[in-house]
């Protein structure tokens, strides 16, 4: 493992090292607010994104199946972060945080910080049912997930979506658009909780 540990968090008396963990919609919005408010001058900013794509619009994710690509879904142009002096580390997941030493840990190394923002977003709920780890059981959350769904649909005739929330219905519509006979199943425990 390459060690990128900095000996001290602060870069100079005028700037602080700010690490943003998460390059989704919230992490990107936070970075935009730093830029727009002029506060960026106070920080040396590094942003970690687990995904290989920079921040994109998850609300319109289903449009990926009808021709939009990662670039057209992106929340900013390819040069945005570089132009504003933000170091974006796409495809580099944070695996641990050492609060005592003020370090963020990834598979590539350790990164010191003075200030830390956690904007990790959410993860899809996968019901604890038999078969939930089968090859054809996929989640609908990221562009890579959609690539996997599209690939699986080429050899399928039916699709089942577990969950009838916004993303579940978007996923069902996407499966229909991929010419699959599609059913939506509500997960009973979650539905029961919603009714009580």
Can you describe what each PLM-predicted range is?
Residues 2-19, 76-162, 183:
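FAD-binding core/adjacent interface of flavoenzyme oxidoreductases
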Residues 7-87, 174-195:
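Beta1-alpha1 glycine-rich phosphate/pyrophosphate-binding loop at the start
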Residues 27, 168-169:
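N-terminal Rossmann-fold NAD(P) dinucleotide-binding loop
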Residues 53, 124-125, 145, 167, ...:
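Surface-exposed, flexible loop/turn segments at secondary-structure boundaries
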Residues 97-98, 170, 191:
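Short secondary-structure capping/turn micro-motifs that flank functional sites
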Residues 139-142, 168, 196:
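Short, conserved glycine- and acidic-residue-centered signature motifs
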């Amino acid at each position: 493992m390459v060690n990128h540990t900095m000996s001290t968090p602060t870069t100079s008396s005028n700037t602080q090292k700010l690490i943003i963990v998460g390059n989704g919609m919230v992490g990107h919005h936070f970075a935009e607010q730093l830029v727009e408010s002029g506060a960026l001058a106070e920080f040396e900013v590094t942003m970690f994104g687990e995904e290989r794509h920079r921040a994109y619009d998850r609300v319109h994710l289903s449009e990926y199946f009808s021709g939009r690509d990662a670039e057209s879904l992106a929340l900013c142009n390819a040069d945005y972060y570089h132009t504003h002096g933000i170091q974006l580390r796409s495809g580099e997941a944070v695996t641990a945080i050492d609060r005592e030493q003020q370090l963020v840990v990834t598979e590539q190394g350790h990164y010191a910080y003075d200030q830390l923002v956690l904007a990790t977003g959410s993860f899809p709920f996968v019901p604890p049912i038999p078969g939930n780890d089968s090859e054809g059981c996929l989640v609908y959350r990221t562009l890579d997930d959609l690539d996997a769904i599209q690939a699986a649909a080429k050899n399928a005739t039916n699709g089942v979506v577990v969950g009838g929330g916004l993303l579940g219905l978007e996923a069902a519509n996407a499966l229909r658009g991929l010419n699959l006979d599609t059913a939506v199943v509500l997960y009973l425990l979650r539905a029961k909780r919603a009714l009580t």
